[in-house]
């Protein structure tokens, strides 16, 4: 078991190196959403109920400098409290980007406008923040770095919309976590690129009713996973299907 654990850690390290995640950087962190993180549900990535989608409470909203117009949705970051004296707690926590922290140009960036460009900032779910700092701190300096996401099961595809407007929510992405591109294929069509509608909702205007559906997902590190015929021909809008994984 010990050898298996070491091999797994080495595998993650190789993934991080291959993706070019880089080293530690400096930012600040605050918290929102309440003690049960119920206020973090929904959000600009489109994940909806973070509990049922498997993201839980280890999540964060990213400032403009990190959010990248939604392209960063699903990426994972390791954070540790940095130089905040008695407010810091030892250790680190890994969070998934699930929301956007909007700028507040009415306040200076060092006094309330924490998410103003070009500041990197994490507005963490309260339970996640309390892993690295005390509640009374309110805001703390942190060190952060991109890390590979670890997920259970395969990439999930929730097919919403209607005929000629297929809106597919892509969730539970391991590895890089974020998604660069998605393609869709019906059993009677070829591969067709989808466009990012918002967050991790991807759009196709093709008529695909009554066809089995396949998906091809490419992450920001260039790796691609193809999930063939994951949705049977009788699929209905609102259903979720599980494919392969990175």
Swiss-Prot record:
UniProt-recorded name of the protein: Expansin-A4
Topology of this chain in the membrane: Peripheral membrane protein
Family membership noted in the UniProt record: Belongs to the expansin family. Expansin A subfamily.
SUPFAM superfamilies: Barwin-like endoglucanases, PHL pollen allergen
Segments forming domain Expansin-like CBD: 164-243
Signal sequence annotation: 1-18
Keyword Disulfide bond: yes
An example Gene Ontology CC term for this record: extracellular region
Organism in which the protein naturally occurs: Oryza sativa subsp. indica
Domain Expansin-like EG45, first and last residues per copy: 42-154
Loss of function: phenotype: Plants are smaller.
Inducing or repressing factors: By gibberellin (GA3), submergence and wounding.
Taxonomic path: Eukaryota, Viridiplantae, Streptophyta, Embryophyta, Tracheophyta
GO BP terms: plant-type cell wall loosening; plant-type cell wall organization or biogenesis
Its job: Causes loosening and extension of plant cell walls by disrupting non-covalent bonding between cellulose microfibrils and matrix glucans. No enzymatic activity has been found. Required for normal plant growth. May be required for rapid internodal elongation in deepwater rice during submergence.
Keywords: Cell wall, Disulfide bond, Membrane, Secreted, Signal
């Amino acid at each position: 078991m010990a050898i298996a654990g070491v091999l797994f850690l080495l595998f993650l390290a190789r993934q991080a190196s291959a993706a070019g995640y880089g080293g530690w950087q400096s930012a600040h962190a605050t918290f929102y959403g309440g003690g049960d993180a119920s206020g973090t549900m929904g959000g600009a990535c489109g994940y909806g109920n973070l509990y049922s989608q498997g993201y839980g409470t280890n999540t964060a909203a990213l400032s403009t400098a990190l959010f990248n117009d939604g392209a960063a949705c699903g990426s994972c970051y390791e954070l540790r409290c940095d130089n905040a004296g008695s407010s810091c707690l030892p250790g680190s926590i890994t969070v998934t980007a699930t929301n956007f922290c909007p700028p507040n140009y009415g306040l200076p960036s060092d006094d309330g406008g924490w998410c103003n460009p070009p500041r990197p900032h994490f507005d963490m779910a309260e339970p996640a923040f309390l892993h690295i700092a005390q509640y009374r701190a309110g805001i703390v300096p942190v060190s952060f770095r991109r890390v590979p996401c670890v997920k259970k099961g395969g990439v999930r595809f929730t097919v919403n919309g209607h005929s000629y407007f297929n809106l597919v929510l892509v969730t539970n992405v391991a590895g890089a976590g974020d998604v660069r591109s998605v393609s869709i294929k019906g059993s009677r069509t070829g591969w067709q690129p989808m466009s990012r509608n918002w967050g991790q909702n991807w759009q196709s205007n093709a008529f695909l009713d009554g066809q089995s559906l396949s998906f091809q997902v490419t992450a920001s590190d260039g790796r691609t996973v193809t999930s063939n015929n994951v949705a049977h021909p009788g699929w209905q809008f609102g259903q979720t299907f599980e494919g392969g994984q990175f």
